Amino acid sequence: ADIVDDAALRLSLLERGAKIAEEKLQQPQMAFVVLQSAIAENWKNADFMAELQRLAEATGSWGELVGQFEGMIAQATSPADVLALHNIVARWYFHHLNDNEASWNHFAFVLDQDPKNLDALAAMTEIYWRLGNWDELVNILSKRLELTTVTDDRVSLYMELGKVFEEKIGDVGQAIECYIQAFKLSEDRLDVMKELARIYEMAEQWSELIDILEREMAVLDDVEEKIAVRFRIGTIWENMLQNNEKAAASYAEV
């Protein structure tokens, strides 16, 4: 293959050789080594990278692959290539080598050069979840909220931030505020309403719970579900707020 000048043809021949090694010779490690020789020219090729990673997984060669890419980082001259390579290696450390520190270091480099890199920020979120570093997780989610403009993504981030405050930090007030912000962005999202209703009930904020249940009823299509919510509102008026008049009015609508 060394005498072949055309890069596309050279890659095609190497891929064919790798396929023969794996399927005919039953030597996936040889197939991996064959493709390794094409990395420098083809690491930006999505199909090539998918096959390379498949073989790395099949042969347990992630450490070797990461080492090769670490060497490429040291030799890269394009700032864009350096960032892209750091991103790739960081993900491999996290997902395949379970090395949180190495993954963090590579993503930290990316963010130092590109503080608004949403992909790197999202990856750092995963690292902090794994490490249980809740304060840093709050910071990184807040940073992502500052940079994210897509409404559905902002809703998801507020919901995730609320979960951190509620379940990991134990700050129910902050959690409620996050869920409220998510609701304001998506007033027709039933899943957001149910989460807000759940935490209002847990916090015994009965008036707020009734308000959100009323909003929930407005978007429900199923008649039986509407009846169940209306009955629930009645029981809250009766048992929690001791307002029999409001309870009777709610029951009357069932």
State where each predicted segment sits:
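Repeat-based scaffolding regions
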Residues: 1-254
